[in-house]
């Protein structure tokens, strides 16, 4: 298995009660022009069992973070470990993937189990995690000042853990899948990074939420 398309007819772990993991795998399959109907679904009980199914020869692929500790075990096993890439110039593949998993974003993956001097990176995907979320009833003042505190104090916590660069102002994605709170929008407008295009996108997301709520 070297590409997502190579998963056709293969055994793929399907985690009971985990729409997040299975949804991400559906996005990977879609990139290769496939769906769950094109693979052999191997039902497993959890995240660890998903990777162990590959190690034990019960499955050929599983979904997980590229830095997940369980993959160290996979990498050391006779079966080995490989992350099929998602070439960023494959426009058709990305269109299919995003149609199924709209939270996917292109990313050059440099932190993964099994990396080496001859295998330092690959073109794949990522998505913001963790993120700040709140309820619509949260006050605009609180949302504004929390956003301001995170953005303005980034230099003080940027080295506190992996993935902190996601809290940098220049890395914010204003056209993603969740609507922004008015307080956050107020701050980003003050910084000059929020445009009318983002207003339109945000309004559409709020409208979509209203429809789903009904």
Where would I find each of the regions flagged by the language model?
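A generic structural-conservation signal
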Residues: 16, 38, 63, 197-198
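Short helix-loop capping/hinge motifs at secondary-structure junctions, enriched
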Residues: 1-3, 138-142
């Amino acid at each position: 298995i070297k590409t997502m398309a190579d998963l056709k007819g293969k055994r793929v772990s399907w985690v009971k009660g985990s729409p997040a993991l299975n949804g991400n795998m559906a996005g990977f399959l879609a990139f290769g022009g496939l769906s769950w109907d094109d693979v052999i679904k191997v039902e497993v009980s959890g995240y660890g069992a998903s990777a162990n199914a590959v190690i034990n020869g019960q499955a050929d692929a599983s979904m997980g973070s590229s830095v997940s500790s369980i993959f160290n075990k996979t990498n050391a096993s006779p079966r080995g470990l490989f992350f099929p890439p998602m070439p960023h110039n494959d426009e058709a593949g990305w269109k299919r993937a995003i149609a199924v998993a709209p939270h996917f974003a292109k990313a050059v993956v440099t932190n993964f189990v099994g990396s080496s001097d001859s295998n330092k990176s690959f073109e794949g995907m990522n998505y913001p995690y963790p993120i700040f979320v709140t309820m619509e009833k949260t006050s605009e003042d609180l949302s504004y000042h929390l956003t301001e505190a995170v953005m303005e104090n980034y230099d003080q916590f940027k080295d506190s853990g992996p993935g902190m660069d996601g809290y940098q102002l220049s890395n914010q994605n204003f056209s993603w899948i969740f609507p922004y709170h008015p307080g956050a929008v107020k701050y980003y407008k003050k910084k000059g990074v929020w445009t009318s295009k983002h207003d339109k996108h945000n309004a559409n997301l709020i409208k979509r939420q209203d429809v789903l709520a009904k």
